[in-house]
Structure formats: structure tokens, C-alpha cells
Amino acid sequence: MYYRTRTYIAGDWDNDKDAVDALHRWNDSSRYGLSFSDAHELKQARDTSLNCSIKRSLAERLDASKTFILIVGEHTKELRAGGCQYCNSYNSYWGTCGRGHTVDTRSYIDFECEKAIRDGLKIIVLYKSTVVNRSKCPEVVRNRGIHAPMEKWVGNTLYWDYDSVRNAIG
């Protein structure tokens, strides 16, 4: 059993890792006022683990969290990784798991968002963009929580918008 003191960050780790890295840089720097304990530091799941094992590990991290941050990029809404149908143990004819686990066809993102809502976590949706475009956000959190852009234009140069993120996180 964990105390809910952590911040859980979800997103497209293949395409939007730079946004996650920006959050960590702001958190680790004494120059910025962002301060959070990352829930992903609690327990690691190997990328070679079964989807159901990874979801169990994600659930443990969410159980220790009070805040859920979702990074929304170009492809976040379309991500499908994590569903049982993509596991070698899944029998598509019968719709069952060959290892006897419960079948869960949700992606990791959908699983994380739904658990954050069910657990009553503070939800923050940060868009890897200069604008909030809710059509890119997974439907389950589209109208929940605080939504804010992570980027801004200064002249002709695109920068991370620390002030927008800090105001959203609080």
C-alpha cells in the first residue's frame, strides 16, 4: 500500500518523450518551481513483459499517485499498444488468454486514463502544441481535468512553455 504522493506521467513514449523530458528537466532544476515525485520511479516493468504484467505495474504506480498528467501529441489518441489482442498469448478465435489472464483490449493510454478517473486523481492534460486541441485527446479525459498547451511561439521560434505547464499543474 502506497501513500498517494506521486505524479504519474502518461503519453506516447515513442513520439513525445521530449515533452516528458522537459517536465523532468523543470522538476530537476533549481531554477524552476516545478516539483513532483515521479510515480515511474517506484517499479519498473520490462518492455518484454506481457501486456497484462505491464498494466499491473502501471496500476501500482497509479495507486501511489495523486496527480495524473497526460501528454497529448499527434498520435496519442490512436495508440493501441497494450491491448491483449497484440499479445502472443491471445487466442483471437475464442477471445481468451492462453495464460488464463483476464482479457483487456484497452491500450495502455486508455487503461491509465480510466484508472486515473476511477481513482479520483487530479487530471492534467498537456498538449505538445501551442494550442489545446481536444480532438487529439483520448475521449475518456477529453472533458475532464485541466487542459493546457506545452509550447509557445516567440517570434519565429517554438519553445517549451514552462509558465503554461506550471499554471496547469498548480
Region locations from a protein language model:
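C-terminal interaction surface of TIR/SEFIR-family domains
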Residues: 4-6, 127-170
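Short aromatic-enriched loop/helix-cap "lid" or pocket-rim segments at secondary-structure transitions
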Residues: 21-22, 83, 135-139
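Conserved BB-loop
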Residues: 30-57, 74-89, 94-103
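Surface-exposed, flexible loop/turn segments at secondary-structure boundaries
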Residues: 15, 76, 131
